[in-house]
Amino acid sequence: MSGRGKSGKARTKAKTRSSRAGLQFPVGRVHRFLRKGNYAKRVGGGAPVYMAAVLEYLTAEILELAGNAARDNKKSRIIPRHLQLAVRNDEELNKLLGGVTIAQGGVLPNIQAVLLPKKTAKSS
């Protein structure tokens, strides 16, 4: 009778909320952070699932673009520079992360148009 409680029925295998929602990010941990963070007195059951899904989507989006930047630079490992290039070259991500500084990210290459040499028309 091992694995059975008082009711006599076998206990089903525990299923995480992340796997129920089809997510990789930990729903339970997000729920704990929402409760401990003093954001509200009470946290609904769907809130951590939704937030974990949003975090997972944003992470996947940034990593996709950073992987493309790494491949363009002929590198197999994503470094902070690739994250910076990915975020700053994407209009929506740049707006979302406008006030964020990425350590060791560098700057985007940019030369103002007025500093470029003048185009002279050669007449021959």
Curated annotation (Swiss-Prot):
Q: State where composition is biased (Basic residues).
A: 1-18
Which SMART domains does the record associate with it? H2A
List every position bearing N5-methylglutamine.
Answer: 104
What is the recorded post-translational modification? Monoubiquitination of Lys-119 gives a specific tag for epigenetic transcriptional repression.
**GO molecular function per UniProt:** DNA binding; protein heterodimerization activity; structural constituent of chromatin
Q: Which residues carry this modification: Phosphoserine?
A: 2
* Stated name of the protein: Histone H2A, embryonic
Q: Which organism is it from?
A: Psammechinus miliaris (Green sea urchin)
